[in-house]
Amino acid sequence: MAEEQARHVKNGLECIRALKAEPIGSLAIEEAMAAWSEISDNPGQERATCREEKAGSSGLSKPCLSAIGSTEGGAPRIRGQGPGESDDDAETLGIPPRNLQASSTGLQCYYVYDHSGEAVKGIQDADSIMVQSGLDGDSTLSGGDNESENSDVDIGEPDTEGYAITDRGSAPISMGFRASDVETAEGGEIHELLRLQSRGNNFPKLGKTLNVPPPPDPGRASTSGTPIKKGHRREISLIWNGDRVFIDRWCNPMCSKVTLGTIRARCTCGECPRVCEQCRTDTGVDTRIWYHNLPEIPE
């Protein structure tokens, strides 16, 4: 999944750079619209007309008729058939990094697929691919999601359709790149980040580590030879709510377990005195005392 997303990001960035370098000219749009209006009544002649234009150099000044679809929002649409795609998949029309007159191999088209192979509206919707229409046979606008299956093919080797990867466009895109090959227009920061992340799983992380001591062995616990002193212990609870302090004080037998909260425990050993001598003179025991200010609390 990460490789697929990286491919979409790289293709989208290259298309955006191409559009920024040479935006779509109004003349090219008008010619595409005129060509589409001529064949709208007879769509069966689209493929034959396109092949006739590719046969001669004079066809470079006109758009490939099979690549033109309906228009939305003033932007022409193109139609591309890739592996597993139908003729009805309308794609967004764009202009490659070269002008139509300057291209020596034929018209180059720009189109956008989503992950399901459906047409995507808008040029900046981005998993787009620059392709070349001056190829042989039905490889004119090959592309789409099925190209991700050939992502392991090296440059120069034929894909599953039998066409060399290096024949795609004046600036070919390697389909063998991985997520670590992604570079943005600003530089190679993402490339370096992905490289470090990929290495992080194979090498131990440097820096300080927290050494947690093992739990103590109960068998080796030192036991005191003196018995636990019998009697009572004083427990105090302080609650502060921002403007006042509440204090609870009480006593519990020494043999009882210390727990959080105002809990009156009972003697478990049977040897603790029933009445605490300190509680006899302490009027605050078992009575909540509150103070408005901290200095008012006696030490």
Curated annotation (Swiss-Prot):
Question: Per the record, what is one GO cellular component?
Answer: host cell cytoplasm
Query: Site described as Interaction with host STAT2, positions?
Result: 240, 246, 248, 250
Task: For the region Disordered, give the residue spans.
Answer: 41-99, 134-162
Region listing for Interaction with host STAT1, in residue ranges:
110-120
Q: What keywords is this UniProt entry annotated with?
A: Host cytoplasm, Host-virus interaction, Inhibition of host innate immune response by virus, Inhibition of host interferon signaling pathway by virus, Inhibition of host IRF7 by virus, Inhibition of host MDA5 by virus, Inhibition of host RLR pathway by virus, Inhibition of host STAT1 by virus, Inhibition of host STAT2 by virus, Inhibition of host TYK2 by virus, Interferon antiviral system evasion, Metal-binding, Viral immunoevasion, Zinc
Report the GO molecular function annotations: metal ion binding
Q: Which GO terms describe its biological process?
A: symbiont-mediated suppression of host cytoplasmic pattern recognition receptor signaling pathway via inhibition of IRF7 activity; symbiont-mediated suppression of host cytoplasmic pattern recognition receptor signaling pathway via inhibition of MDA-5 activity; symbiont-mediated suppression of host JAK-STAT cascade via inhibition of host TYK2 activity; symbiont-mediated suppression of host JAK-STAT cascade via inhibition of STAT1 activity; symbiont-mediated suppression of host JAK-STAT cascade via inhibition of STAT2 activity; symbiont-mediated suppression of host type I interferon-mediated signaling pathway
Q: Which residues bind Zn(2+) 1?
A: 232, 251, 276, 279
Query: Which Pfam family, just one, is annotated for this protein?
Result: Paramyxo_P_V_N
Where composition is biased (Acidic residues), the residues are: 146-160
InterPro entries named in the record: Paramyx_V_Zn-bd (IPR024279), Paramyxo_P/V_N (IPR028243)
The free-text domain note is: The N-terminus interacts with host JAK1 and STAT1. The C-terminus interacts with host STAT2. The C-terminus also interacts with host PP1.
**How does this protein assemble?**
Interacts with host IFIH1/MDA5 and DHX58/LGP2; these interactions are involved in the inhibition of the host type I interferon signaling pathway. Interacts with host TYK2; this interaction inhibits the type I interferon signaling pathway without affecting the type II pathway. Interacts with host IRF7; this interaction inhibits IRF7 translocation to the nucleus. Interacts with host CHUK. Interacts with host RELA/p65; this interaction inhibits the nuclear translocation of NF-KappaB.
Identification of the protein by name: Non-structural protein V
